[in-house]
Design a protein with these regions (language model features):
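ATP/NTP-dependent adenylation/nucleotidyl-transfer catalytic domains that generate, transfer
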Residues: 11-14, 177-179, 183-263
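ATP-dependent adenylation/nucleotidyltransferase module used to activate substrates
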Residues: 1-184, 263
């Protein structure tokens, strides 16, 4: 079993750990146990967390010496109404469909936007502001290189906001390494993260990053009220056929190119 690296944590007086309580974060949180007495554990609530995750985080947080639940932007629904749905549909990583969907009448009534904009305002900016307020001397992250295999050293430097006082204890771990650690230490996870699924479940309203049909099925089965709110009450049902129409239009071009290459 691989070991975590916590270089510099002994000297740190105010370490901070942003924890989603997913598998990676939960593994790192377990490894942090010897230093939890001085580590600020921060749960970044994007406003669209699955209810069981939010409850799990706060219940777990009650037993931590230092814990903060940060929800700077409030409910995701307010942002959806004013700024649009976080969506980013790509075709084989060749061109995004967001712009073409935006001009359709049905979709324009509800608006869509890049999911990265949503992430920045609901996760990264609140994290930055809280860090400026708390002034930690060591940043701890559960990020892994496997999550971003094409990122360069410069990319990782940017993600660290230029600070040198940061550590990623499981940076070189694989998914299998993480699950091996979790199983060996019998670490419990919130219901939403227990399925060992490959999609991301940080926000039930996200239609962008790592979207899978299993994630939508899970929402319908476990949280039917939220599913109905997304696809009925809030009008997303109107966007679905628009997305399909644009998707078919885009793929038809590349199918045509493939046929030309075969001639």
């Amino acid at each position: 079993m691989k070991e975590m690296r916590f270089d510099g944590i002994e000297k740190a007086e105010k370490p901070i750990f942003y924890c989603s309580f997913g598998k990676d974060s939960s593994a790192v949180l377990h490894g942090l146990e010897p230093w939890l007495h001085k580590t600020m554990v921060v749960f970044l609530d994007c406003g669209g967390m699955y209810p069981d995750i939010t409850k799990w985080a706060d219940d777990y947080g009650k037993g931590l010496p230092k814990y903060m639940h940060v929800n700077a932007e409030g409910s995701i629904w307010d942002a959806i109404r004013s700024r649009g749905w976080p969506v980013d549909v790509s075709v084989a990583n060749i061109g995004k469909l967001g712009a073409s969907v935006m001009i359709e009448e049905e979709a324009s009534r509800h608006k869509v936007r890049e999911y990265t904009e949503c992430i920045n305002e609901r996760i990264w900016l609140p994290a930055y502001v809280f860090s400026q307020m708390y002034q930690p001397d060591l940043f701890i992250s559960g990020e892994r290189k496997e999550d971003r295999p094409f990122a360069t050293k410069e990319d990782w430097a940017i993600r660290t906001s230029g600070v040198k006082n940061s550590i990623r204890p499981i940076f070189d771990w694989t998914d299998s390494d993480v699950w091996e650690y979790i199983d060996a230490h019998e670490i419990d996870l919130p219901k939403t993260y227990q399925g060992r699924q490959e999609d991301r479940r940080d926000c039930f309203a996200c239609l962008g990053h790592n979207l899978t049909i299993d994630r939508i099925k899970y929402l319908k089965e476990e949280y039917p009220d939220l599913f109905n709110k997304m696809f009925t009450e809030e009008g997303l049902a109107e966007i679905v056929p628009v997305m399909i129409r644009n998707l078919k239009r885009s793929t038809s071009v590349w199918e045509g190119i493939a046929e030309l290459l075969e001639d």
